[in-house]
């Protein structure tokens, strides 16, 4: 039986990565979530990070939020451009799965294209990954 999981190389795991994406990337708001999006240096590799504070609710609510965001990303990640995404809840309401799918399909490409159009220099923490599983590197 094949498990549909999100592989480790498709996740944002380290604090340094989260800081880089939030500082160097652009942000946009979906229906119930906030996306921080930064272009990826690796073609064909889209990464996801999720942050949920304790203000959102108890552990079972936070875990459910993370679970549905991961599943929506897993369904849409092959149609997304190469980028790094950090997702945060906008308020204390649980988002609907269908809304998340729609937000991933519409908001992420728009935020990434606006970031590339502005083309402003990045400041702050630079992140250089060592052990990535993405094959080709963008110039």
From Swiss-Prot:
GO biological process: tRNA 5'-leader removal
Domain of life: Bacteria
Coiled coil: none
One annotated Gene Ontology cellular component of this protein: ribonuclease P complex
Biased composition (Basic and acidic residues): 129-139
GO molecular function, one term: ribonuclease P activity
Entry EC number(s): 3.1.26.5
Cysteine pairings via disulfide bonds: none
Function: RNaseP catalyzes the removal of the 5'-leader sequence from pre-tRNA to produce the mature 5'-terminus. It can also cleave other RNA substrates such as 4.5S RNA. The protein component plays an auxiliary but essential role in vivo by binding to the 5'-leader sequence and broadening the substrate specificity of the ribozyme.
Record family assignment: Belongs to the RnpA family.
Name of the molecule in the record: Ribonuclease P protein component
Species assigned in the record: Chlamydia caviae (strain ATCC VR-813 / DSM 19441 / 03DC25 / GPIC)
Lineage, top ranks: Bacteria, Pseudomonadati, Chlamydiota, Chlamydiia, Chlamydiales
